């Protein structure tokens, strides 16, 4: 079974840091924040095998560009599958205006 390198963009790392900070600092739940961060990180690392398992997004031009969406709890991980690598572009709260935030 083919394995892919998983690359996380600076923007996606920043998104994850903001998610952690919001839960830990604003909601005053540092243990919950760490758990959420770890679940997202583990899900991202799991993309090294069968990254095509998640659907392409429905909006254009993102769909044509090959952008896929993986749900992790209340968050969406957006990524593109290349020949040998998966590139994670963003990690966003699923209840937000995702199409607007992706552009």
Name these PLM-found stretches.
Residues 27, 68, 72-103:
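Enriched for short, Lys/Arg-rich terminal
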Residues 1-63:
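Basic, Lys/Arg-enriched alpha-helical interface segments
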């Amino acid at each position: 079974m083919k394995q892919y390198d998983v690359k996380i963009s600076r923007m996606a790392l920043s998104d994850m840091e903001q998610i952690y900070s919001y839960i830990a600092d604003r909601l005053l739940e540092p243990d919950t924040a760490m758990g959420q961060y770890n679940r997202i990180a583990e899900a991202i690392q799991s993309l090294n095998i069968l990254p095509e398992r998640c659907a392409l997004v429905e909006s254009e031009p993102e769909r044509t560009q090959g952008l896929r969406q993986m749900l992790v709890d209340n968050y969406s991980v957006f990524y593109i599958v290349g020949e040998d690598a998966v590139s994670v572009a963003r990690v966003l709260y699923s209840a937000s205006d995702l199409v607007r935030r992706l552009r």
